[in-house]
Amino acid sequence: TGMIVSTRESEKVRGRLLNLGISQISGASRTSVGGYEKEERVHDSEQFEVSDTRTLDEVVGWLMDNGHIPSFCTACYREGRTGDRFMALCKTGQILNCCHPNALMTLTEFLVDYASEETRKKGFEMIERELNKIPNEKRREIAINNINDIKASNRRDFRF
């Protein structure tokens, strides 16, 4: 149902592929065993060479600059919406009532917990615009409440 582009590809190639419909893109990847445990990359043990070496904050900012909503959502997998269940929601267009608010809520978590001030500002402006585009009014209201809760507390992991 989608294709993923890794950091093996350059920023330029990744940008072109996003505009062709790529649904997932990695950022700040580490490709060596134990690579996420250390700040410094161990280049001689990497599985492949990374072409896009930007930080996750830079990739998230770049995605928003290009009109994409960065999402850290894993709700479908965690809720068992896989295979036929997932495809049924996709074919009817109802997945939008899950994906869109989930993307905005997970983006809020990233912005609050990890983003630079510049990325945070950009992200909250995008979220404000995008909330009005959630088609289901009840879902929109719940998403707004959850986003406000994420900003005001340590509560996380809201999902539809």
Predicted feature residues:
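Conserved C-terminal portion of the radical SAM core fold
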Residues: 1-12, 31-33
